Swiss-Prot record:
Pfam families: Alpha-amyl_C2 (PF07821), Alpha-amylase (PF00128). This is Alpha-amylase type A isozyme. Ca(2+) 2 binds at E133, T136, D138, D142. It catalyses: Endohydrolysis of (1->4)-alpha-D-glucosidic linkages in polysaccharides containing three or more (1->4)-alpha-linked D-glucose units. Changing D204 to A/N: Loss of activity. GO terms for cellular component: extracellular region.
Length: 438
């Protein structure tokens, strides 16, 4: 192929990669679970065989596990950040191949960035593990105890700055106010982009450092998106269920987005407010899915362009099951997030292991076919204990819940295009006709 032809192909691929982001059509996919590191032959190699199915389902971004050496097998206790070959998921060459395969299908790769804390390779003169090795032959990321927050007294030498966020007891909390820490972490993030091919970030335990510090790393590395895990407890009643009013919870998430730069920033948050409310709502309390202003009750209702919605992830579900979605109602959860505003995230387990691949893909197809975006208009038509019905952009209607007699609230001119266990989706006649012809 000539030079001009190669340039043309590259430009087309770049347009494909950027299309979802520019238009708000992102559909995320978490490409691992808590047990993925155990995969025989390596997780990255196994995932090579899943790329076609993921891309065919309309996914725009795949979130991959932490890429570096880690004291814990899962990757969340990182040490030598440049040492990719030591990962339990596979080596650097295998990771590059996987990212290349994703890019070849127009799908971006999200790196799981764990920078709140870090594990040291060596002890200092006190016998404390606080001497860090970066994983290169030079001094990059080779830090000492003066890079550990001084209020992390178990590890620090007392000379650094105070922690800007929540404590992480299991490993040293890194001083993100330190100029060298900021500079070398930004260099590492840029290397993840330039050398490995990553496009975007998922910020692990983002409560551990201030949003102002997150802004430094987002602004300094220009990811296509940076979705943060800011997981706080929800206010609950005496029965253990979440209170109806979760405005304080979602306000905290909105505040994080504001402080990293708001609409101008690539920063966004996982919508833990929606997750918690939806968990409870599908148990016969679907009245929860509307706030007093008639909007969705999570971050989705206030700032949908910055709300990454999800049913479960490697922490809430998988084998950890810290906060699992009701297992017999998972597809109700997907019917909700895949038809609604916000940026939905599909979990690997539900797609590949639970037998929901075709149903989830059908819902994504409806989303794409009707041009539903992160900021689509939501009109809630019914919100009772056993039935929730909503219209999106005047093009799609969705019902979740056990009640079947909801025909009276379905607008004229809509026909059923997807249905399953206690959920159904309708499209306008024109969209349904297009589906039948295709």
């Amino acid at each position: 192929m000539g030079k001009n032809g190669s340039l043309c192909c590259f430009s087309l691929l770049l347009l494909l990669l950027l299309a979802g982001l520019a238009s708000g059509h992102q559909v995320l996919f978490q490409g691992f679970n808590w047990e993925s590191w155990k995969q025989s032959g390596g997780w990255y190699n196994m995932m090579m065989g899943k790329v076609d199915d993921i891309a065919a389902a309309g996914v725009t971004h795949v979130w991959l596990p932490p890429p570096s050496h880690s004291v814990s097998n899962e990757g969340y206790m990182p040490g030598r950040l440049y040492d990719i070959d030591a990962s339990k998921y596979g080596n650097a060459a295998e990771l590059k191949s996987l990212i290349g395969a994703l890019h070849g299908k127009g799908v971006q790769a999200i790196a799981d960035i764990v920078i709140n804390h870090r594990c040291a390779d060596y002890k200092d003169s006190r016998g404390i593990y606080c001497i860090f090795e970066g994983g290169t032959s030079d001094g990059r990321l080779d830090w000492g105890p003066h890079m550990i927050c001084r209020d992390d007294t178990k590890y620090s030498d007392g000379t650094a700055n105070l922690d800007t966020g929540a404590d992480f007891a299991a490993a040293p909390d890194i001083d993100h106010l330190n100029d060298r820490v900021q500079r070398e972490l930004k260099e590492w993030l840029l290397w993840l982009k330039s050398d490995l091919g990553f496009d975007a970030w998922r910020l692990d335990f983002a409560r551990g450092y201030s949003p102002e510090m997150a802004k430094v790393y987002i602004d300094g590395t220009s990811p296509s998106l940076a979705v943060a895990e800011v997981w706080d407890n929800m206010a609950t009643g005496g029965d253990g269920k979440p209170n109806y009013d979760q405005d304080a919870h979602r306000q905290n998430l909105v505040n994080w987005v504001d402080k990293v730069g708001g609409a101008a920033s690539a920063g966004m948050v996982f919508d833990f407010t929606t997750k918690g409310i939806l968990n409870a709502a599908v148990e016969g309390e679907l009245w929860r899915l509307i706030d007093p202003q008639g909007k969705a009750p999570g971050v989705m209702g206030w700032w949908p362009a910055k709300a990454a919605t999800f049913v479960d992830n490697h922490d809430t579900g998988s084998t950890q099951a810290m906060w699992p979605f009701p297992s017999d109602k998972v597809m109700q959860g997907y019917a909700y997030i895949l038809t609604h505003p916000g940026i939905p995230c599909i979990f690997y387990d539900h797609f590949f292991n639970w037998g929901f691949k075709d149903q989830i893909a059908a819902l994504v197809a409806i989303r794409k076919r009707n041009g539903i975006t992160a900021t689509s208009a939501l009109k809630i038509l019914m919100h009772e204990g056993d039935a929730y019905v909503a219209e999106i952009d005047g093009k799609v209607v969705v019902k979740i819940g056990s009640r079947y007699d909801v025909g009276a609230v379905i607008p004229a001119g809509f026909v059923t295009s997807a249905h399953g266990n206690d959920y159904a989706v309708w499209e306008k006649n024109g969209a349904a006709a297009t589906l039948q012809r295709s």
